[in-house]
Amino acid sequence: MPVITLPDGSQRHYDHPVSPMDVALDIGPGLAKATIAGRVNGELVDASDLIENDATLSIITAKDEEGLEIIRHSCAHLLGHAIKQLWPHTKMAIGPVVDNGFYYDVDLDRTLTQEDVEALEKRMHELAEKNYDVIKKKVSWHDARETFVKRGETYKVAILDENIAHDDKPGLYHHEEYVDMCRGPHVPNMRFCHHFKLMKTAGAYWRGDSNNKMLQRIYGTAWADKKALNAYLQRLEEAAKRDHRKIGKQLDLYHMQEEAPGMVFWHNDGWTIFRELEVFVRSKLKEYQYQEVKGPFMMDRVLWEKTGHWDNYKDAMFTTSSENREYCIKPMNCPGHVQIFNQGLKSYRDLPLRMAEFGSCHRNEPSGALHGLMRVRGFTQDDAHIFCTEEQIRDEVNACIRMVYDMYSTFGFEKIVVKLSTRPDKRIGSDEMWDRAEADLAVALEENNIPFEYQLGEGAFYGPKIEFTLYDCLDRAWQCGTVQLDFSLPSRLSASYVGEDNERKVPVMIHRAILGSMERFIGILTEEFAGFFPTWLAPVQVVVMNITDSQSEYVNELTQKLQNAGIRVKADLRNEKIGFKIREHTLRRVPYMLVCGDKEVEAGKVAVRTRRGKDLGSLDVNDVIEKLQQEIRSRSLQQLEE
């Protein structure tokens, strides 16, 4: 009979099989009331599942990440329960958990309106407030199939036929009269599912195949308590205000149009930000001793076949042909960098060789996945590849890590989650090589005092990698930086160097990106700063304004002086009230507004005002220029007097 070992090491002995709920009750009624599920020998199970042998057990509650995920999954079933009551002929497809919530794909003979969604949410609340028990039954494959055939659930039948073995015992979850099929676990009672909201609907093809029927996807969010739900909805509201597409239009940064889906038309102010970002990256390339190169936009398909990209990536590649040759528009820069490395004989003395490029890449992303600057078809990577020996890997990775944190800190990103992906089952190279490579990456992270978590088996077949995910002011995750070891591509493309023993050897290649895509990173920055770019990045850094025509000459002189000092400046001499001008440039998020009245002209000064509405008073012109230059030069995130 089972001996149950709890997380604190204590043990409980039973003379009969017990469930996680039984153990929780044994510990105390408070824990039993909070129990959502259990983790038995590392595997999540329902609170009602029986444990027949000795096992370790952790009780899962709403405070656990897994508990919240289970709540969300059960809310998807609750949605199914409600929709079948409102529209009984609905056919249910799949209802998984996603970030911050869940969705359910349904086949319904009407297009859901906003009023329908509100009615559906209301019915979900009515059902959840009944606090009914969720009953799990493990049945044979044949019984499960018969259940769903009788209920006309053709999609569930298809899942059984195509995805579940005949000797398996699927779990059927009974929500009163509604039955759904799932691996589970799910909540034992609907009292855990009171804090949710339906968010939107969208179209989705069955199994993601455009040849199949288009279903309606209903998205929802769910949380453990009302406070967490409200906080999330507030974050969404703030995110909507910060949407880079909205701000991009307001500030005239860029646009996109139907004739070039997923391609950016940069306007002057947006392109100014892009170029300033390039200047910043170039300064870091110089500091960390990189060469900068430029490869062609397209290369013969034969080359992409050699690299393996054609076999694995051709659907995402744009192609063209000329003179009976097929060319691929590059989706990435690495093969081109190997071609540059291969020009001329290389010695071990030439290594490490660090090669960087602002590479213009194109990928044929599905049109439905395109999203402003965040998901595009044409983008610029701040890409680099380091060619080195195995002995140099650790030092080079160390330098890459320092560079990543150096650059992210400039933008104020402090919360960065790091993951190390290790060898997959299918891979090239010896175990010894992988042992050393993984150890080199881990030691480099440890030497920089960076906490990280392993993603076991998630590395590429050609080498392990480090991923850097930064979190913005709304605590949203953005995976931007990567450091990826590659033991395959140099060999495939015949890259070599002459070692100390005069023998030809294949270099290790380190793929390194920090911002990822320039376009996407500008989108992230736009939302992070809500369009209030730090002065060094702002398209227009200063606007000089007159109050009346009598100050026009002084404004022009001052504007020229600022321009000569390397400051991006505009003069506003319009015959408008000064309050109107200040408000307009504040809405345009211009960092500084310099106002010139008769007093300022007479004293050779200027009244300085920030876009946040702070009045810095009347200051000496040369002092203002010096302070602005210092703020811009240091790439400060703070404005004067902040």
Swiss-Prot record:
Judging by the UniProt lineage, the source's domain of life is Bacteria
Gene Ontology MF terms: ATP binding; metal ion binding; threonine-tRNA ligase activity; tRNA binding
> Any note on cofactor binding?
Binds 1 zinc ion per subunit.
Residue ranges of domain TGS in the record: 1-61
Q: Does the keyword Protein biosynthesis apply?
A: yes
Could you tell me the keywords of this UniProt record? Aminoacyl-tRNA synthetase, ATP-binding, Cytoplasm, Ligase, Metal-binding, Nucleotide-binding, Protein biosynthesis, RNA-binding, tRNA-binding, Zinc
Keyword Lipoprotein carried by entry: no
- What SMART domains does this protein's entry cite? tRNA_SAD
- The record's top EC class is ligase
Provide the residue span(s) of the region labelled Catalytic.
Answer: 243-534
Q: What is its EC number?
A: 6.1.1.3
According to its UniProt record, which cofactors does this protein need? Zn(2+)
User: Under the cellular component aspect of Gene Ontology, which terms does the record hold?
Assistant: cytosol
Which CDD domains does this chain map to? TGS_ThrRS, ThrRS_anticodon, ThrRS_core
Q: What is this protein called?
A: Threonine--tRNA ligase
The UniProt function text for this chain reads: Catalyzes the attachment of threonine to tRNA(Thr) in a two-step reaction: L-threonine is first activated by ATP to form Thr-AMP and then transferred to the acceptor end of tRNA(Thr). Also edits incorrectly charged L-seryl-tRNA(Thr).
Which locations, inside or outside the cell, does it occupy?
Cytoplasm
Query: What quaternary arrangement does the UniProt entry report?
Result: Homodimer.
Main location per the UniProt record: cytoplasm
Annotated binding of Zn(2+), by residue: C334, H385, H511
Q: Origin organism of this chain? A: Salmonella typhimurium (strain LT2 / SGSC1412 / ATCC 700720)
What is the similarity comment for this entry? Answer: Belongs to the class-II aminoacyl-tRNA synthetase family.
Q: PANTHER family this protein is in? A: THREONINE--TRNA LIGASE, CHLOROPLASTIC_MITOCHONDRIAL 2, THREONINE-TRNA LIGASE
